[in-house]
């Protein structure tokens, strides 16, 4: 979803009439709550408007710009045979649901959990999924590509499988001492 996210951020800054941060800075916005990202470069009074512009663009265009990494459909097919799969994301739930439907992967997941004002951080969303499905932390593993995934896992006591493709920086991921590391989708199947 990085293309759609990047485009949504640049569109938002353009609509607000302010210079867009560089691509590296925008890449760093992928993972934390939108409000936190916008707070690093906009005045407080513009944050709510920025979030609204971003979400409107992302809902209309951004989710259609998302693409799956190679081998992900095959990975989801295999994992869903043996494990219940859930998405925990800092996107809001309807957007995440729309995106999975658009990508043709919605049917692989037993639940999709996104952020809300009550659950703004990754750990909050993970806790919501664990509680809803009555899972103990030791029964869950996060497969994540950002430090925010690793932090959310640490804060909730679940195991961490870091993937080195995607948004995150491999060096950043390693600082959170993941239980497993996957450099390609097939590595996940070998490690679980």
What feature does the model see in each segment?
Residues 19, 105-110, 136:
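Conserved H-loop
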Residues 5, 34, 68, 122, ...:
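Conserved donor sugar-nucleotide recognition element shared by glycan-biosynthetic enzymes
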Residues 106-120:
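A short, structured active-site edge motif that brings together acidic residues
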Residues 12-13, 33-45, 99-100, 129-130:
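Helix-loop "lid/cap" segments that line or gate small-molecule binding pockets
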Residues 60-87, 93-97, 123:
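Short, acidic loop-to-helix structural element flanking the phosphoryl-transfer center
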Residues 141-180:
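Acidic, Mg2+-coordinating phosphoryl-transfer loop and its flanking beta/alpha structural elements
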Residues 1-28, 40, 47:
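Active-site neighborhood of HAD-like aspartate-dependent phosphohydrolases
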Residues 122-150:
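Conserved Lys-Pro-Asp/Glu-containing loop-to-beta segment of HAD-superfamily phosphomonoesterases
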């Amino acid at each position: 979803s990085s293309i759609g996210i990047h485009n949504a951020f640049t569109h938002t800054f353009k609509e607000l009439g302010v210079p867009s941060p560089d691509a590296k800075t925008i890449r760093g916005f992928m993972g934390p709550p939108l409000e936190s990202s916008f707070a690093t470069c906009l005045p407080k009074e513009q944050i709510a408007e920025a979030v609204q512009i971003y979400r409107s663009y992302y809902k209309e265009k951004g989710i259609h710009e998302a693409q799956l990494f190679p081998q992900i459909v095959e990975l989801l097919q295999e994992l869903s045979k043996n494990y219940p799969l859930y998405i925990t994301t800092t996107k809001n739930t309807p957007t995440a649901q729309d995106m999975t439907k658009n990508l043709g992967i919605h049917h692989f997941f037993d639940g999709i959990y996104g952020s809300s004002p009550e659950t703004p951080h990754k750990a909050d969303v993970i806790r919501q999924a664990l509680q809803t499905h009555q899972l103990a932390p030791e029964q869950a593993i996060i497969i994540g590509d950002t430090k925010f995934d690793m932090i959310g896992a640490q804060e909730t006591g679940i195991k961490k499988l870091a993937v080195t493709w995607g948004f995150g920086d491999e060096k950043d991921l390693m600082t959170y001492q993941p239980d497993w590391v996957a450099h390609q989708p097939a590595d996940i199947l070998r490690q679980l």
